[in-house]
Swiss-Prot record:
Residues 313-407 are annotated as: Disordered. Residues 370-384 have a biased composition (Acidic residues). Residues 346-356 have a biased composition (Basic residues). InterPro entries: DUF3654, UPF0329. This is UPF0329 protein ECU02_0060. Pfam families: DUF1609 (PF07753), DUF3654 (PF12376). Belongs to the UPF0329 family. Residues 313-345, 357-369 have a biased composition (Basic and acidic residues).
Length: 602
């Protein structure tokens, strides 16, 4: 729901219009093809929920301030930018603490919020100075600064609650008896909602709940940042994706200021309860889930996260045991080889032994040479042909050149290649396939999925030396009897004039011959919905596929595109862009995918 908050904040002047007719006329003009009904339905129900702030500051594609960043850690060229963001934090925090949207009443509530905030004396509290001037042990992290601002603003929550209650009571008394009964009833219900909310804000329990929830979020972000590289990368990319969405929304609204910490809905009671019972690990996963899915949490969310963590721990235990068993077997084989050599040397004469030893050395040398040849032949068989424009085939590389790019060579599972076919053919294969979740889909659904899955040109980037600048690798895990891992990038898909931000997902597993096999390739938008999505809070996992038939793979040898131009590929240091065109009229662009360079993480 965080992105809906951005829409609402960006559209303050429209949504606060006194006349509903003005709003309905202005929204379509500003939003273009956005689904107006969907937005208004969202804001109808999102008014009184609790909110939290994620303690990150981004500048372009770089996290310039993380939860643990101290002022001295910020580069000189970024300090002025960061200071400008921090100057606005007290107001951003205030809005996140008490802001509500109620149709027909937003303008005076917003005005009251601003009046209470502006009437507050900030003498002796300057967040920039607090962040800059602390020295030694008193030097604070950014997460600590955010909490200091929350505590300072907490002093005036009660004052705002009291003012809100008084003004609502006046409005209820002033309601005209001549008003139609249905309209009067609707207004009374909304005003009573606001009244109850204002009374809650006056209680110490509510004020403490706000601070506790935000403290847990800050601690969870620190925990994820310090836990390990995979969690650090995961939360950074999730925040980066949401910042890209904010940037797109605000640029469409001609509001260019982007970079301040993001605000999300997150049920305070559920978060605090989960933290008390399961501690920081579960809280961290819940924060990741909110960032990933842009949805509030509930008790079911907590249960799914707890189960997911237990499954992951069990998975890691099994992997560790399997690795230990492999190491023991390898040690036994080495010991047996040594014993065999000792027995062979005892029954021989010295001269013969010397000759035999030389012979053995030669034989071992030959075996090593053969082993190298075998490795090179396997390596030569694995590379995927580049998806060149017009079906051009790349120049054949020598075995030595290919061995240098060992990690860039992949085989492709046929479940990935099927998305290159027509929607009708794909539907036929899915309806008669083994994956139950794909059966019975309509042609319209297949065409929507094809736009997300038919991105085989991404393999050109995966095979390049630039791959690691655009994709991050996740840890390995077990699923369906195979060891899997994933590569995750960030992209923007544009089709029909609509831009969607999301992850470029690559799912891989190791074949019996040791080759890397791609079984999942997809652009997954941040607004993507699928069954069981909430059950998979882990970053980058492509768990929608159970057992995989290894026999159904291809190294793409001999593959040619149909005559004509399917796509054009351009690449720069910051982006890899694929543009798909109409093969009959290449001036018509069907869609495009831009894979962006991942944020620099220090």
């Amino acid at each position: 729901m965080g992105m809906w908050l951005v829409w609402i904040f960006a559209l303050d002047n429209i949504l606060c219009a006194s006349k509903e007719e003005e709003k309905k006329c202005e929204l379509p003009r500003r939003l273009g093809e956005m689904n107006i009904k969907e937005i208004t339905e969202k804001v109808e129900i999102d008014g009184l929920d609790t909110k939290i702030i994620i303690p990150f500051i981004f500048h372009d594609a770089k996290p310039v301030v993380s939860p643990i960043t101290r002022y001295r850690d910020i580069s000189q060229e970024e300090r002025r930018y960061v200071e400008e963001i921090i100057k606005g934090l007290p107001k951003l925090v205030w809005d996140s603490m008490v802001w509500i949207y109620v149709p027909g009443y937003t303008w005076w509530i917003k005005s009251l919020m601003d009046n209470v905030f502006n009437a507050t004396s900030f003498e002796g509290f300057n967040p920039v100075d607090l962040y800059k001037k602390a020295k030694g042990k008193s030097e604070i992290r950014f997460a600590d600064l955010v909490m200091s601002i929350f505590r300072f603003n907490g002093r005036i929550v009660n004052r705002f609650g009291q003012r809100l209650v008084r003004e609502v009571e006046v409005k209820i008394k002033e309601m005209s008896n001549e008003m139609p009964s249905s309209e009067k009833k609707e207004k009374e219900e909304r005003l009573n909602q606001i009244l109850e909310y204002g009374k809650k804000l006056c209680t110490r329990e509510k004020q403490e709940e706000m601070l506790k929830a935000q403290k847990i979020v800050c601690d969870a972000c620190v925990y994820l940042w310090e836990k390990g590289s995979e969690d650090r990368v995961a939360i950074t990319i999730m925040v980066y994706l949401r910042n890209l969405e904010v940037q797109m929304i605000r640029s469409s609204m001609k509001k260019v200021k982007v970079g301040e910490p993001l605000t999300f809905y997150m049920n305070h009671e559920v978060l605090i309860s989960a933290y008390k019972e399961y501690k920081i690990g579960v809280a961290g996963e819940l924060v990741k889930q909110v960032l990933k899915n842009d949805k509030d949490i509930d008790s079911e969310s907590v249960n799914r996260v707890v189960c997911s963590i237990r499954e992951r721990e069990e998975d890691e235990r099994k992997r560790a045991e399997a690795e230990s068993a492999r190491n023991r077997e390898e040690l036994l084989r080495m010991e047996e080889r040594e014993k065999g050599k000792e027995k062979g040397s005892k029954g021989k004469g010295r001269k013969k032994r010397g000759k035999k030893g030389a012979g053995e050395a030669k034989e071992e040398s030959k075996e090593e040479d053969r082993g190298g040849e075998e490795e090179e032949s396997v390596e030569a068989d694995v590379p995927v042909e580049e998806m060149a424009v017009g079906g051009a085939r790349p120049k054949k590389k020598s075995p030595k050149e290919e061995s240098k790019g060992e990690e860039r060579c992949y085989k492709v599972h046929k479940r990935v290649l099927r998305w290159m076919k027509s929607a009708e053919r794909i539907k036929y294969e899915l309806d008669n396939g083994e994956e139950e979740k794909w059966r019975g889909r309509s042609i319209e659904e297949i065409e929507e999925q094809k736009a997300l899955h038919d991105i085989i040109e991404v393999l050109k980037l995966l095979r390049s030396k630039e791959c690691d600048k655009f994709f991050v690798r996740t840890g390995k895990y077990m699923k369906g009897g195979s060891e899997r891992w994933n590569m995750v990038g960030v992209g923007i898909l544009e089709e029909g004039g609509k831009k969607r931000v999301g992850n470029v997902e690559v799912g891989l597993f190791e074949g019996k011959g040791g080759e890397n096999i791609i079984y999942h390739l997809m652009f997954k938008p941040t607004d993507f919905e699928e069954e069981g999505e909430g059950a998979r809070p882990s970053f980058g996992r492509c768990d929608g596929v159970d057992a995989i038939e290894e026999g159904r793979i291809s190294d793409m040898s001999g593959f040619q595109y149909p005559p004509g131009v399917r796509s054009e590929i351009t690449s720069s240091g910051s982006e890899f862009r694929i543009v798909w065109k109409n093969q009959r009229d290449t001036s018509l662009v069907l869609r495009s995918l831009t894979v962006l360079r991942i944020p620099e993480i220090r």
